[in-house]
């Protein structure tokens, strides 16, 4: 696995570069990406936004927001006791895909969560995308216990029609 530098993204330039990677990696238009102002607000309110760098070039990113473990029918539980991260999106420039950067970003996200005392990270992925399945289950050891049909609704870009 090739080593790249991974560090938090904190500047408006970082957020704009993240948007460009989002569009390139997922084949999206600007309207279908997370705006830089939203990334800035999320990053300053408990979200974890990390970037992978090859030298000075941002080549990939991962975003996770704070959430709570679902406890249907139990609104009396204190949220702090149910904290988790929800890994929202990861994007890697096509020229750098397949080099283990996704694994490195996910592991860095895990380390950041553990430093905060958060012991659970959840995310969604399409089980028919074999590369994602290999990463999530094969490499990261994720446990799948739920399937949501059409979780994100109609999608654009690379995921259109899935």
PLM-predicted stretches and their roles:
Residues 4-94, 126, 148:
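A conserved beta-strand-loop-helix scaffold within acyl/acetyltransferase catalytic domains
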Residues 126-127, 133:
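Conserved acidic functional residues
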Residues 69, 124, 138-158:
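Conserved catalytic-core motifs of GNAT/GCN5-like acyltransferases
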Residues 96, 100-108:
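Conserved acetyl-CoA pyrophosphate-binding loop and the N-cap/start of the following alpha-helix
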Residues 113-126:
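Conserved GNAT acetyl-CoA-binding A-motif
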């Amino acid at each position: 696995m090739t080593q790249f530098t991974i560090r938090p993204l904190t500047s408006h330039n970082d957020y704009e570069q993240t948007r460009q990677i989002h569009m390139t990696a997922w084949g999206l238009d600007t309207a279908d990406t997370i705006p830089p102002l939203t990334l800035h607000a999320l990053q300053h309110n408990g979200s974890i936004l990390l970037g992978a760098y090859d030298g000075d070039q941002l080549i990939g990113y991962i975003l996770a927001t704070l959430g709570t473990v679902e406890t249907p029918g139990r609104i009396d539980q204190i949220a702090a006791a149910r904290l988790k991260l929800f890994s929202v999106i990861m994007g890697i420039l096509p020229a750098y895909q397949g080099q283990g950067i996704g694994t490195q970003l996910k592991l860095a996200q895990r380390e950041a969560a553990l430093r905060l005392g958060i012991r659970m990270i959840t995310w969604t992925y399409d089980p028919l995308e074999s590369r994602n399945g290999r990463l999530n289950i094969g490499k990261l050891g994720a446990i799948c216990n739920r399937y949501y049909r059409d979780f994100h609704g109609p999608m654009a870009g690379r995921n259109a029609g899935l």
